[in-house]
């Protein structure tokens, strides 16, 4: 989108420059034309002999005037060629046209520069849901399904190197920090091909509550669409975006009526993706902070049990996904810290509440795989260290209060902000125990 705007602004700028140059040249050309008309009035070129006689007569008259008594008379260009009033009016009109056209060209240039400056200063916006239908990819012959760009070939190890540490401040909960994988940019895969336990991966969702767009949210959409295609389910990115948005907005309306409680929605019949869905809000969105500062629907968490047709790798241990909305990095520190800690605590609290439901008893969550929420472009000028600290404080608060019995897995982050934040929280906790 920014490339399109940049092309439009460049075209507008060049057009303004050409307009200013052309109008200035046009005005100069018209002035020269008028000058030529003044220097050669009608009748002079066609009657050269008569002009000579007129000159002689005027010469004699001039001599008489010079030697005649009385005040001297002023000489002007009208003595030989009388000024034509219509020519003078045209000259003035052409000058006005030149000035106006030049002013318009300058105004266009200044407007283009102003819009370009405002566009560059504009903060990054939340990605919009996809609006174009994707052309279905040709399927490989049966038994020879080709690997997609989002998943490496079957022979490439999926699980990246990791570091697992117990944290006393988290009740000795084991936390795994993934290193870079063999995928593009070292990204951690959303799910493993053969997991030993059920791990629910948390999607860093959009404020508009749809699945799709860019970043991790787009990777979730791509994974679900590829699984649907493998199983012959006709599902487009637009349909997935609209359907997920409709389901999650419905869950949100139910959840805000019962803050702090997990609400349930049976989506099995009407949904091509979700067998069952849950919604949770720790507090009513916008009650403890201004949504104009942190963003809409911050703190909400959704849990979806995926249908077998869209479950990654067809493994039942991959059939649970979570979706949450974290704050952007623009608000003041106090507001941001409160919203972020509430969000991450809500994710852990919702997963613990889900395990107490009948569906959770059937498909219990034994681990959470999380990204560093809002650690990308939407953090604005906020440091990754401050996000890591807020994440650690919210996680410690939730585990201390609700004591969930599952491990935490953090996806690869080059800054290691989540690791450093938890290490700092651990040091603070151990120091307080010694006191």
Swiss-Prot record:
Topology versus the membrane: Single-pass type I membrane protein
Subcellular localization(s) per the UniProt record: Parasitophorous vacuole membrane
Transmembrane segments: 97-117
Keyword Cell membrane: no
Record's compositionally biased regions (Basic and acidic residues): 55-64
CDD domains assigned: MAF1-ALBA4_C
Protein name (Swiss-Prot/TrEMBL): Mitochondrial association factor 1 form b0
Organism taxonomic ancestry: Eukaryota, Sar, Alveolata, Apicomplexa, Conoidasida
């Amino acid at each position: 989108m920014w490339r399109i705007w940049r092309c439009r602004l460049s075209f507008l700028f060049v057009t303004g420059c050409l307009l200013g140059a052309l109008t200035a040249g046009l005005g100069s050309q018209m002035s020269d034309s008028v000058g030529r008309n003044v220097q050669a009035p009608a009748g002079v070129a066609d009657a050269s002999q008569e002009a000579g006689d007129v000159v002689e007569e005027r010469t004699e008259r001039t001599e008489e005037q010079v030697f005649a008594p009385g005040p001297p008379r002023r000489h002007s260009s009208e003595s030989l060629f009388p000024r034509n009033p219509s020519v003078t009016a045209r000259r003035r009109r052409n000058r006005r046209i030149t000035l106006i056209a030049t002013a318009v060209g300058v105004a266009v240039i200044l407007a283009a520069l102003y819009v370009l400056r405002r566009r560059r200063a504009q903060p990054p916006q939340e990605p919009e849901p996809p609006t174009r239908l994707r052309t279905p990819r040709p399927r490989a012959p049966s038994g020879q399904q080709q690997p997609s760009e989002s998943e490496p070939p079957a022979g490439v190890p999926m699980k990246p190197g990791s570091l697992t540490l117990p944290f006393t401040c988290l009740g000795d909960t084991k936390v795994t920090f993934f290193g870079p994988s063999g995928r593009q940019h070292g990204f951690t895969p959303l799910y493993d091909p053969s997991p030993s336990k059920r791990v629910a991966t948390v999607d860093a969702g959009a404020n508009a509550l749809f699945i799709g767009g860019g970043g991790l949210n787009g990777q979730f959409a791509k994974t679900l669409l590829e699984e649907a295609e493998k199983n012959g389910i006709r599902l487009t990115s637009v349909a997935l975006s609209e359907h997920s948005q409709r389901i999650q907005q419905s869950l949100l309306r139910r959840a805000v009526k019962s803050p702090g409680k997990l609400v349930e929605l049976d989506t099995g019949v009407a949904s091509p993706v979700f067998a069952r869905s849950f919604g949770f809000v720790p507090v009513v969105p916008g009650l403890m902070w201004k949504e104009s500062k942190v963003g809409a629907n911050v703190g909400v968490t959704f849990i979806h049990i995926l249908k077998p047709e869209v479950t990654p790798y067809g493994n039942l241990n991959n059939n649970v996904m979570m979706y949450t909305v974290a704050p952007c990095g623009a608000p003041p520190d106090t507001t941001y810290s409160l919203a972020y800690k509430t969000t991450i605590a809500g994710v852990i609290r919702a997963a613990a509440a889900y395990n107490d439901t009948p569906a959770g008893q059937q498909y219990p969550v034994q681990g959470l795989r999380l990204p560093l929420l809002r650690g990308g472009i939407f953090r604005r000028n906020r440091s990754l260290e401050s996000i890591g600290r807020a994440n650690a404080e919210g996680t410690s608060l939730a585990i201390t209060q609700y004591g969930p019995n599952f491990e935490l897995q953090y996806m690869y982050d080059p800054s290691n902000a989540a690791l450093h934040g938890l290490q700092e929280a651990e040091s603070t906790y151990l120091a307080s125990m010694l006191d």
